[in-house]
From Swiss-Prot:
Species per Swiss-Prot/TrEMBL record: Pan troglodytes
Keyword Membrane: no
Protein name per Swiss-Prot or TrEMBL: Neutrophil defensin 1
GO annotation, cellular component aspect: extracellular space; Golgi lumen
Subunit field text: Tetramer. Dimer. Interacts with RETN.
Amino acid sequence: MRTLAILAAILLVALQAQAEPLQARADEVAAAPEQIPADNPEVVVSLAWDESLAPKHPGSRKNVACYCRIPACLAGERRYGTCIYQGRLWAFCC
């Protein structure tokens, strides 16, 4: 029983250690809100990420433009995740 309690404590500490950097990033994003017109269905998002997570386009070394769109990505784009803006879910498309 003691071992189970120790393992649970270690797991909670590990999860908290991973959550702190995510909270710091969320705080940075929340600190700098952008003013975007409500009638604009397209939102341009600038993100910093690990290169290993970047979209791979064979034969292309150009920068990839990514957008948050409703309801879905346009033809030729691929969905890489979800954006949350003004309480709504958007497709993150590149």
